[in-house]
Design a protein with these regions (language model features):
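Active-site-proximal cap/lid insertion segments
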Residues: 1-41, 45-56, 60-183
Length: 183
C-alpha cells in the first residue's frame, strides 16, 4: 500500500518506519491481514464456543489501533480522502502562556517538522485507524449477539489515554490537557 512518514520528515526522504512515530499506511489486503482483524476474528470464534458452554466467562479483547503508526486497510481511508479536506483545530494565540515549560508537549507541529499537509494527513490517518478499529469492535459485538450472549454479558469499552490531533499545536498523548488525559 501507500505509506508516508509524517514526523521528522520535512523533505519527504525518510522511509516508512514502524514504532511510536507518525506514519500513515494505506495498507493492501483485508482486515485479516492486520493484527486487529485477527484479534476480532479470534474473539468471535471464542464467543461462539463460550455460548455452547453456558458458563460465565471473561474475554479481554485488546486492539492496537488507533495507535501510531496509523495502519489500516485502504478501504478505511477512502472517506477521509483527499487529506486536504481534513480540518485542523483552530490555533489560539498565547495558548501556551499559562503552561509551565515542563508541561509543553514535546510532540508539536514545529518540533515534529509537520507542515499543514502532513498534519491533515495525520488527522485522516487517525480517523481511518479509528474506523478500522470500530469495524473490529462491531464484529465482536455482532458475534456476541449472534451467540445469544448480549443480554447476559457486560461489555466494558475503555482506553488508556486520549490523543491530540493538533489541538494546542500538540500531537499524540503526552500532556495533561483534556484531549490527552480524558477517554
Amino acid at each position: 500500500g501507500q505509506g508516508e512518514t509524517l514526523e521528522g520528515n520535512p523533505d519527504g526522504k525518510r522511509p516508512v518506519v514502524g514504532g511510536n512515530t507518525f506514519v500513515v499506511v494505506e495498507a493492501e489486503g483485508d482486515d485479516l491481514v492486520h493484527s486487529d482483524g485477527k484479534t476480532a476474528a479470534k474473539a468471535c470464534e471464542l464467543l461462539a464456543e463460550y455460548a455452547k458452554r453456558q458458563k460465565p466467562f471473561f474475554l479481554g479483547v485488546g486492539f492496537v489501533r488507533p495507535h501510531v503508526p496509523f495502519v489500516a486497510p485502504e478501504k478505511y481511508y477512502s472517506p477521509f480522502l483527499p487529506y486536504s479536506k481534513m480540518k485542523l483545530p483552530h490555533k489560539v494565540e498565547g495558548d501556551w502562556d499559562d503552561i509551565p515549560k515542563p508541561g509543553i508537549n514535546y510532540k508539536t507541529s514545529v518540533n515534529m517538522k509537520m507542515d499543514v499537509r502532513r498534519q491533515k494527513k495525520a488527522v485522516g490517518g487517525y480517523y481511518a485507524s479509528v474506523s478500522f478499529m470500530d469495524a473490529q469492535v462491531g464484529k465482536v459485538l455482532t458475534a456476541l449477539k449472534k451467540a445469544g450472549l448480549e443480554d447476559d454479558t457486560i461489555v466494558i469499552f475503555t482506553s488508556d489515554h486520549g490523543f491530540h490531533l493538533g489541538e494546542h499545536d500538540f500531537w499524540a498523548k503526552v500532556s495533561l490537557l483534556d484531549e490527552s488525559s480524558q477517554v
